[in-house]
């Protein structure tokens, strides 16, 4: 779970709950003890969080326990990656990216490969599939070590919409 502030279209990830082996109710309890909880206005969840698997869907548990409705929508891997990249690029006017991450958010930072994974101490970054020679294989990244990144992407898409390539100029080329 990533806690985010949006100020002037700049996204600041300032806290997280990055745990393994916890059920939805335990994550909710942890979130509700945070000083920022009283200011939470909305949340997002993976589309899978709306599905029942022999128990109430996590989105329903959040609504019942907190009164907070979590929005969800299908976000394709490449669409989400493009939206994230648009916030990682340096804004030419401001001189810095529109996304900043608190250094204490070690779970999310580990998924970007910036710090070791907080549970294993190993580098376990969200990355592209590679062959033995280090070449990228396939059209999508490996679906692991990405829970924080995906949460961030869902929030970016929810708040800012999908990212689209700007109009590209067509250059006419004369053939001989």
Predicted regions mapped to residue ranges:
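Mg2+-dependent endonuclease catalytic cores in nucleic-acid-processing enzymes, primarily RNase H-like
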Residues: 5-137, 162-163, 173-176
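Charge-patterned, long linear interaction tracts outside catalytic cores
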Residues: 135-176
């Amino acid at each position: 779970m990533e806690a985010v502030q949006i100020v002037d279209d700049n996204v600041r990830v300032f806290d997280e709950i990055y745990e393994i082996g916890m059920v939805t109710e335990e994550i909710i309890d942890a979130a509700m003890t945070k000083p920022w909880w009283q200011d939470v206005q909305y949340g997002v969840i993976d589309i899978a969080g709306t599905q029942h698997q022999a128990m109430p869907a996590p989105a329903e548990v959040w609504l019942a326990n907190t009164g907070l409705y979590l929005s969800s929508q299908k976000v394709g891997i490449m669409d989400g990656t493009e939206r994230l990249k648009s916030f990682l690029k340096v804004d030419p006017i401001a001189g810095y990216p529109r996304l900043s991450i608190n250094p204490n958010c070690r779970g999310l930072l580990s998924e970007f490969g910036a710090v070791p994974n907080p549970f294993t101490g190993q580098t376990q970054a969200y990355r592209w599939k590679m062959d033995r020679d280090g070449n990228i294989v396939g059209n999508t990244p490996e679906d692991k070590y990405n829970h924080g990144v995906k949460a961030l992407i869902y929030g970016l898409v929810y708040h800012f919409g999908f990212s689209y390539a700007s109009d590209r100029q067509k250059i006419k080329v004369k053939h001989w």
